[in-house]
Amino acid sequence: MLVKTALFVTLIGLAQAGPLPAKSSGSEDTYDSHPQYSFNYDVQDPETGDVKSQSESRDGDVVHGQYSVNDADGYRRTVDYTADDVRGFNAVVRREPLSSAAVVVKPQATAVVPKVQLKPLKKLPALKPLSQASAVVHRSFAPVVHHAPVTHVVHHAAPAHSFVSHHVPVLKTTVHHAHHPHAISYVF
């Protein structure tokens, strides 16, 4: 019964779906063997002082263009450029002073002397010790050393009929007891 139900649901789904739409031929990109374009823009912002412009045109593989910008030092930089397959990219740069260029004035140094009113110092009496205290004496005592007898800890394992073997190096150490002042140590 489950197989019949699954087959019925599948047939209804196929009937509702319908055929796939055919590819539309209008959305294909075409290759332009001789591209042509031309654009330009101009920015004049008196609030920030940003003044620049650019224009460019292309005819096939040859591009001609120009851009200019007003630099902060009072000059306009203009770049004329050409790019093609034969000569590559070529640019000619010109710098021309702006007509409204500001005259830079050399700064003059002025001496500023602060007026300081000095008051005479008050003479205070010298400090006298309140009492003659004895000098502080530091004494060192012999260090306290704790002695304990040397004990050797030996662990014995009961014999086993079967064991798990691990292939790792065995660390064997000899236990020594050293006398250290003011230290507590445990040797296992």
Curated annotation (Swiss-Prot):
Residues 1-17 form the signal peptide. Keywords: Cuticle, Signal. One of its GO terms (biological process) is chitin-based cuticle development. Disulfide bonds: none annotated. The keyword Plastid does not apply. It comes from Drosophila melanogaster. It comes from the Eukaryota. GO terms for molecular function: structural constituent of chitin-based larval cuticle; structural constituent of pupal chitin-based cuticle. Imaginal (anterior) epidermis. It holds the Pfam family Chitin_bind_4. This is Pupal cuticle protein Edg-84A. Residues 49-62 have a biased composition (Basic and acidic residues). Residues 34-100 form the Chitin-binding type R&R domain. GO terms for cellular component: chitin-based extracellular matrix; extracellular matrix. Component of the cuticle of the pupa of fruit fly. Residues 24-41 have a biased composition (Polar residues). The keyword Chloroplast does not apply. PANTHER family: CCP84AC-RELATED, STRUCTURAL CONTITUENT OF CUTICLE. Residues 19-67 are annotated as: Disordered.
